[in-house]
Amino acid sequence: MDRTTQAVTEELTSGRVQRAAAMARKYMPGKPSDAFTNAADSFHDAMADYGEDVKGDFSAQGRLEEIPISLEAPIRKVKEAAAALVQLINADDEIIDPDENAERARVKGAVQEIATTAGKLLKMGNEHVLWYEPTFSTLHLAPLSVSHVLRSNLLTQNPVIATSATLTVGNNFDAMARSIGFVVGSDADEEIKPGEIDPANLQMLDVGSPFDFANQGV
């Protein structure tokens, strides 16, 4: 679960944005890449100012309820400039040289990642948690639950055997199964696409424990 959460956690730093902007400017010089560079520089300045403002304020260095006001506009400009640049790169379909195609894919991937992350930060809902990490001046966005990620990318695609040393809750594993992404009980009304495995087709088995909890429990 922790590894899945880490894998889907979004991170945005000014350094990453500026590196993507530098790649784009080298690959596709012009006003669109200049706009992205300017947006990246503005975001860098805004993050630096925010970092200075929250020094010593530990309440602003951990979890945030929303994007800080001073960062919202710079992030929006980054997202819009990056998205516009991705559209231009997609429209550049005349490249036939394999090396140039590879370079385009690399630049597009870097810029698209920035656009996607910035967009998710701006649309953050109650199902996500946002926090600021001051050491590397980083914004992190992570889902509170990864059950939907595991369900759509794993449980509906492959048969899964899940094992856990976790004790049952209420004499069953329903809570644990739901946290992994299985569909349990009254939840089993989701539409399954053709070719997918039904995540409600679940068998649970408690094999007991070799420990005598009454005498060996701490």
Which stretches of residues belong to each language-model region?
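Conserved coupling segment at the C-terminus of the helicase ATP-binding
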Residues: M1-V218
